A protein has these predicted regions:
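Bacterial Sec-dependent signal peptides at the C-terminal "C-region" and cleavage site
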Residues: 13-30
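Acidic, serine/threonine-rich low-complexity disordered tracts
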Residues: 25-148, 192-310
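Hydrophobic helical h-region of N-terminal Sec-dependent signal peptides
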Residues: 6-13
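Hydrophobic transmembrane signal anchors and adjacent membrane-proximal interface regions, especially
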Residues: 15-20, 43, 170-172, 181, ...
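Positively charged n-region of N-terminal signal peptides that target proteins for export
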Residues: 1-5
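Surface-exposed beta-loop interaction hotspot
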Residues: 147-192
Length: 310
C-alpha cells in the first residue's frame, strides 16, 4: 500500500504541488503559535543519537540541530549586527547542523549553516549555505550564495587533490540542505514529485561528488513505522537514482514541526564492498536557550541537559 502511495506521488507531482498550496487536513494553520515559538529570543537546540555510515562501517556519535531566527543582510549575506543597516536585512531561519563522530583513531567534525527567508520564502530562495568538514587528514570548506535571483555562486576549498579549489555557478530547483528549514518554516512548501535537487554539501564532500543538480523523486507520507516516535509523524523522502541514495526525514505534523530523526542510505565505497549502508539519527534531547551567552564554566551543566559529554 505504501509503495502504491509513493508511486502516485511521483506520477502525479503536479497534483501534489497544487495540494501543498491548499489547506489540507494534513497540516495545521499555526502562524501565530509559530511566531510565539521562534521569536522569544532563544534558539532551539536538539541533540540526536547518531550512527554514521563511513568507510563501510557504522560509527556512533552526536548530531546537533541549532535552529534560530535572526536578521540577515541580503546585500552582504551576513548576520545584521548594526541596527543602522536594518533596512537592508530580512528575517531568516538559521540552522547550524553539526555532526561529530570518531572513525578509528581520528574524529570527524562537520557543520552546515543554512540561511532561509521566513516570511518571503516564495519570493526569496535560500540565501546562503556554508559547510566545513574537519578530520585529521585535512579540512574542506564550501559556500553557496544566492545571486541575481536566478543562480548560486559556489566556492569550494579542499586539502584533497581530487577536490581542489573551485569557483562555479549552480542553477537548480532546490537544495537538499534547505529542506530542513522548509520543514520548520512551513512543510506545505516541501517540493514533491520529480525535481532537480543539489545534493547536500556534506554528502558531496564525504562521497567526493561534484556539487550539481541531479534528478530526485520527492515523496511524502504519513509515517507508519515504529523506530521513530512523535506526534503525527510524517515521512519525507528524497530518492536519487543516479547515486543509489535516499534520504528520509521524520518530522511532527504539529507546530513547531520538530524533526524527530533522519535516515540516509547509500553505497559504501567499492573498496569497502560497495554494499548499501544507512546513517541513522534519532532525537534524544531538546532545549530552548540563548546559547550565545552560555560560555562560562557554570554553563557546562547545559550539556548534560542536551545529553552531551562534559
Amino acid at each position: 500500500m505504501k509503495t502504491l502511495f509513493f508511486t502516485l506521488l511521483v506520477l502525479s507531482s503536479s497534483l501534489f504541488l497544487g495540494f501543498t498550496n491548499c489547506n489540507s487536513s494534513l497540516y495545521h494553520s499555526a502562524e501565530t503559535s509559530l511566531d510565539n515559538y521562534w521569536y522569544q529570543g532563544k534558539a532551539e537546540i536538539s541533540r540526536f543519537e547518531l550512527e554514521q555510515a563511513r568507510y563501510g562501517e557504522i560509527h556512533k556519535g552526536d548530531a546537533l540541530m541549532i535552529f534560530v531566527t535572526e536578521d540577515f543582510r541580503t546585500d552582504m549575506q551576513v548576520k545584521l549586527d548594526n541596527e543602522v543597516n536594518k533596512d537592508k536585512a530580512i528575517n531568516v531561519m538559521k540552522l547550524n547542523f553539526v555532526r561529530e563522530f570518531p572513525t578509528g583513531i581520528y574524529d570527524y567534525s562537520a557543520m552546515t549553516s543554512i540561511f532561509t527567508p521566513i516570511k518571503d520564502y516564495k519570493t526569496e530562495r535560500c540565501l546562503k549555505i556554508t559547510n566545513s568538514v574537519q578530520e585529521w587528514c585535512g579540512h574542506v570548506f564550501t559556500q553557496l550564495n544566492w545571486q541575481d535571483g536566478k543562480r548560486y555562486n559556489a566556492k569550494s576549498f579542499s586539502y584533497f587533490e581530487a577536490d581542489g579549489d573551485k569557483d562555479f555557478e549552480l542553477k537548480a530547483d532546490y537544495l537538499e540542505d534547505e529542506i530542513w528549514n522548509i520543514i520548520r518554516i512551513n512543510p506545505k512548501n516541501l517540493p514533491l514529485g520529480r525535481v532537480n535537487m543539489v545534493t547536500s554539501t556534506l554528502y558531496s564532500r564525504l562521497g567526493h561528488w561534484s556539487l550539481r543538480p541531479i534528478e530526485a523523486d520527492a515523496l511524502l507520507s504519513v509515517y507508519e513505522g515504529d523506530e521513530f516516535e512523535g506526534e503525527e509523524l510524517m515521512e519525507y523522502e528524497l530518492i536519487y537514482p543516479e547515486h543509489a541514495r535516499n534520504l528520509k526525514i521524520f518530522y511532527e505534523n504539529v507546530p513547531p514541526y520538530k524533526i524527530q530523526g533522519f535516515q540516509e542510505t547509500y553505497k559504501a565505497p567499492f573498496w569497502k564492498g560497495g554494499e548499501k549502508m544507512t546513517t541513522t539519527a534519532k532525537r534524544t534531547h531538546t532545549i530552548l536557550s540563548e546559547y550565545w551567552d552560555k560560555y562560562s564554566l557554570k554553563d557546562r551543566t547545559l550539556r548534560e541537559k542536551l545529553g552531551l559529554k562534559e
